[in-house]
């Protein structure tokens, strides 16, 4: 009778039956061997990524200064001044008021065709400034607002030419074929569990590799 060989435990089972396989796969030693196998494989992949990044930096493909200043922009010129946030917010508020009502209130148009005149509403229903109504009180002058110079950024936005923060490095896109490696996983339970562990481990290694690159950049300055 053929026996079942477990690739993760490197051993043969006594019988090749579904019940024996299920019992073996639910065992503590088998689960530990599966976790150790995929953890070791992910460490090798992360080390290869670190080696490739270091080699690219030494070859000059990665610049020494990861935050270069964009030339020809107002925000990066020496001696350029940035307006305080309060002035920028006041200017944006004033611009919003002008844009909300770009056209002044027009007078009433001609009456309907035929020469008839429209009967005005009684004074109680007329708005301020209408015929027969009391004059509207004078408006209080608003605060003096300063408009931002050309090239200034709106409130809540970075000024032109400001350096952007580096995005965290993303790990490789994992597929079932890539995760399995040289062996084939025979149970969907192990696939789901291994993928969960691999995602966490990949994020940790990617962050560590990014720190190694930045430390190397700082040492080379």
UniProtKB/Swiss-Prot annotation:
Keywords from the UniProt entry: Metal-binding, Nucleus, Ribonucleoprotein, RNA-binding, Zinc, Zinc-finger
Pro residues bias (residue ranges): 134-166
Chain spans, region Disordered: 100-168
SMART domains xref list: ZnF_U1
GO MF term (any one): mRNA binding
GO (cellular component) term, any one: commitment complex
An annotated GO BP: spliceosomal snRNP assembly
Subcellular location: Nucleus
Zinc finger (Matrin-type): 4-36
UniProt keyword annotation of DNA damage present: no
Matching Gene3D superfamilies: Classic Zinc Finger
Pfam families referenced in this protein's UniProt entry, alphabetically: zf-U1
Function statement: Component of the spliceosomal U1 snRNP, which is essential for recognition of the pre-mRNA 5' splice-site and the subsequent assembly of the spliceosome. U1-C is directly involved in initial 5' splice-site recognition for both constitutive and regulated alternative splicing. The interaction with the 5' splice-site seems to precede base-pairing between the pre-mRNA and the U1 snRNA. Stimulates commitment or early (E) complex formation by stabilizing the base pairing of the 5' end of the U1 snRNA and the 5' splice-site region.
Subunit structure: U1 snRNP is composed of the 7 core Sm proteins B/B', D1, D2, D3, E, F and G that assemble in a heptameric protein ring on the Sm site of the small nuclear RNA to form the core snRNP, and at least 3 U1 snRNP-specific proteins U1-70K, U1-A and U1-C. U1-C interacts with U1 snRNA and the 5' splice-site region of the pre-mRNA.
Family note: Belongs to the U1 small nuclear ribonucleoprotein C family.
Name the record gives this protein: U1 small nuclear ribonucleoprotein C
Source organism (scientific name): Branchiostoma floridae (Florida lancelet)
């Amino acid at each position: 009778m053929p026996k079942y060989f477990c690739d993760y435990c490197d051993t043969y089972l006594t019988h090749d039956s579904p019940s024996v396989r299920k019992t073996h796969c639910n065992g503590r030693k088998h689960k530990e061997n599966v976790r150790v196998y995929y953890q070791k494989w992910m460490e090798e992949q992360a080390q290869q990524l670190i080696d490739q990044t270091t080699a690219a930096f030494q070859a000059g493909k990665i610049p020494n200064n990861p935050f270069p200043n964009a030339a020809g922009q107002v925000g990066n010129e020496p001696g350029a001044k940035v307006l305080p946030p309060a002035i920028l917010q006041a200017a944006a508020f004033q611009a919003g008021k002008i844009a909300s009502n770009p056209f002044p209130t027009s007078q009433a148009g001609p009456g309907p065709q035929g020469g008839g005149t429209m009967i005005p509403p009684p004074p109680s229903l007329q708005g301020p400034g209408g015929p027969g109504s009391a004059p509207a009180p004078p408006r209080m002058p608003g605060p003096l607002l300063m408009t931002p110079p050309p090239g200034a950024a709106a409130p809540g936005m970075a000024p032109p030419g400001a350096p952007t923060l580096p995005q965290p490095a993303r790990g490789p896109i994992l597929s079932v074929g890539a995760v399995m490696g040289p062996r084939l996983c025979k149970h969907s339970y192990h696939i789901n569990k291994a993928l969960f562990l691999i995602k966490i481990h990949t994020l940790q290694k990617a962050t560590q590799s990014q720190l190694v690159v930045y430390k190397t950049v700082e040492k080379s300055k």
